[in-house]
Amino acid sequence: MTEPTLNFHIQTHQNQFKIPHELIKKNFKLIQKLIEKQRKQLIDDISKIKKCKTTSPSFKLELIQKLIKNFESFMKKLQNFINKDEEFRSRLIARLENLTELQQYVITNNDNQEGQNHEESTENNNNNRNNNNNSTTTDDDKLLDFHNPNLINWYRDQTNLLIVDYLIKSNTRTRFEDNGEDNPGNIGLLLLKNLTKTNPKLLKLIDYDLLENFNKVFVSIINNHDLSLIVGWFNENKNLLNKINSNLEFEINYCKFLTLIEKGDINEAINYSRENLSGYGNKENYQQTNNNNNNTFSNGDTTSTNHLTNLERLKGLGGLLVFRSMENNNKNNNDLNSNDTPLSSKLMLNSTPFKEYQKLLSNERWESLAQCFIENFTKLYGISKNFPIYIYLSAGLSSLKTKSCYHNVENTIFKHSTGNGIDYDNGNDDYDDDDDDDDEGGVIDSNLSFISAETTTNTNTTSNSGKSLLNDPKYRGPNHYYKLLNKINNCPICSPELFKLSQNLPYAQLITSIFNNPFKLPNGNIYPFDKLLAPTDKYLSEKNTLLRANKVKDPLTREIFTIDSCIRVFPA
């Protein structure tokens, strides 16, 4: 059964319920803490009022008024938490109703009977087999009616949500410069805002606020090298992160320490290391976190791994401090003497250890912090680290990918306009499956650069301003994009948009064929081998003559080929 069924959609949409569920749990714990804190504060304030027997009534009145104000502030905070809880629960209800809507698009028994009556002309054995399969599907799982226009609209909404999810997470823009209005800086939120004008229920089907916060923290780390947002997120979720033996706190302190060294604050970096990094060299500090967890075995492995990894990274910091202090001293001496750099300094700066320690100040530390943040974020909310749209695309591309992909000579999308091919089909590992917009854009741009100057001139691919039309989003569709490239592509696997994603996917499991023992002729046509060998009455003598010469004739083109040149194409 290859058609998506009702149970299939229920299973694939389970992750939509995880984030609201975790947010409800987190919000409930905050309510408990708030109530407990207010209870203790209220008891203390009342006891103080009772003990103040000698004080004037006016002073007692001030204490009571202060108590009332504190309680009113508590009620406002509590109401905010209650509103959040209602919002999270409404998201769960909306997503449940969204899945329940599929029940309306299920194929009914009447539809099955009509389909069975329509297939009465087939063989009896096949009829019995189909009837058994239909009854099993109706009892255990239910097929969806893809001819229902409402179901198509439902799929369109789900596709829009996948695109919004991808754009929110991968957004790198912080502000729109088109106008002065307060438009959302996240391009995914802008798309969601436009979609909700016609379908307001989409707001309940995606956790846009949480994903936006995730994107802000990620962009602040990778692009801005700012630790303020990640520190705030860590403090907000510190208790939950300790339960999963998170290494995020070390990554934050590690980046902060290297930032101080990079600025030249050696003394401040040493003091910061003593207060915030020295404890990670002692394994006992990790054991304290492990004892508070239930899963002792798995958490113990994680603790041991974190300790060994952090210890190795801490060992390199001492050497970095020595070399950076020597470098600063040499700079100070050179400024005082205003002479050329001494030979010892040149040897030190060009030495291999110094270059190795200098690598610690590269962007790798920010990438490591960002990766640790992604792992902790996805683990807290029980979601996948991959984009959901990539998962769906991978499933669809795997069903289309064959061994002829990247080898079709008629597909010129990856060839120069001069006819020189490009080797993308020899297990090239240069294209990694990274979830990054810049990489995806790099694939498209690399294909755009294949256009020669002559082709660009002939096809008028540049505007009056000198900007290439190929960079214009409106020309990225199938009607303009490949035409401007002057190339042909009829395969989604080989397209530049999906080539990178589909490269490492498995081939489709082609275990059936409409032909019996199909063979491919040199001209590309495929026929059952029995049809090529079995002569008809009209061409009986001609085929017999060809077979004696070990040759066959194409029934359509009338071309003659040797049998040895035919290739068996099944199984793939």
Curated annotation (Swiss-Prot):
Alphabetically, which GO biological process terms does the record hold?
Answer: negative regulation of gluconeogenesis; proteasome-mediated ubiquitin-dependent protein catabolic process
Organism superkingdom: Eukaryota
Q: Name one GO molecular function term.
A: ubiquitin protein ligase activity
Q: Where along the chain is composition biased (Low complexity)?
A: 124-134
Spell out the InterPro entries in the cross-references: CTLH/CRA, CTLH_C, Fyv10_fam, ZF_RING_GID
Residue ranges of domain CTLH in the record: 210-268
What are the protein's UniProt keywords? Cytoplasm, Metal-binding, Nucleus, Zinc, Zinc-finger
Which sequence ranges does the entry mark as zinc finger (RING-Gid-type)?
491-557
Cellular localisation: Cytoplasm; Nucleus
Q: Where are the transmembrane segments?
A: none
Q: Which residues form the signal peptide?
A: none
Q: Where is this region: Disordered?
A: 110-142
Q: Name one GO cellular component term.
A: nucleus
What Pfam families does the record tag this protein with? CTLH
Role: Involved in the proteasome-dependent degradation of fructose-1,6-bisphosphatase.
- Family membership: Belongs to the FYV10 family.
Its recorded name reads: Protein FYV10
Could you tell me which species this protein originates from? Candida albicans (strain SC5314 / ATCC MYA-2876)
